[in-house]
């Protein structure tokens, strides 16, 4: 099983690489040909989209999506998969999942720490913006925690920082790419 982590010059690439490596995944730079492409989180939406475009990852991810090949977005990666985010004055996303991302209006911002995701257990969150999409599949404290549409699936939390439960979640992501 090989995994391509779509770096964009920022983000949590190394921790995601380590987490998938612990599960036995082999890392590759071939975004189109990998069993699973991962869009990691952390950073600014505008800088992330610019970095994806500079590296050609936006085109490679669109090709994967159109071919029905799995893409997994983590935190900002989930938000970048949407049509648009209001972050940085408004930024077009990859347009893989209908929806948008908006600044959190309630509670402490940024939202950082452990929070329950439906009945699955607690995962680690670190974000100031959240997805708004009709394709949500899990929630945490009124915020979309997971969304799936076509071959794209993503989570707002950080499974790579969520201990044993996060490792189980990443294993599920790998298993979806085996189908």
Per-region residue spans from a language model:
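Short acidic low-complexity segments
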Residues: 25-34
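Alpha-helical elements of the RecA-like P-loop NTPase motor core of helicases
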Residues: 14, 46, 50, 164
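Cysteine-nucleophile active-site neighborhood
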Residues: 42-111
């Amino acid at each position: 099983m090989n995994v391509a982590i779509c770096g964009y010059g920022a983000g949590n690439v190394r921790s995601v690489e380590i987490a998938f490596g612990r599960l036995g995944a082999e890392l590759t730079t071939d975004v189109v040909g990998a069993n699973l492409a991962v869009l990691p989180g952390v950073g600014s939406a505008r800088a992330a989209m610019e970095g994806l475009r500079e590296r050609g990852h936006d085109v490679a991810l669109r090709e994967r999506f159109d071919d029905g090949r799995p893409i997994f977005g983590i935190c900002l990666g989930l938000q970048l998969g949407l049509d648009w985010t209001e972050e940085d004055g408004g930024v077009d996303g990859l347009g893989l999942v209908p929806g948008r991302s908006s600044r959190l209006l309630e509670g402490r911002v940024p939202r950082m720490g452990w929070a329950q995701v439906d009945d699955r257990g607690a995962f680690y969150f670190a974000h100031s913006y959240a997805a708004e999409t009709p394709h949500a599949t899990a929630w945490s404290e009124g915020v979309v925690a997971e969304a799936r549409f076509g071959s794209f699936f993503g989570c707002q939390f950080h499974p790579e920082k969520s201990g044993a439960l996060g490792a189980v979640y990443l294993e599920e992501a790998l298993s979806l790419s085996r189908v």
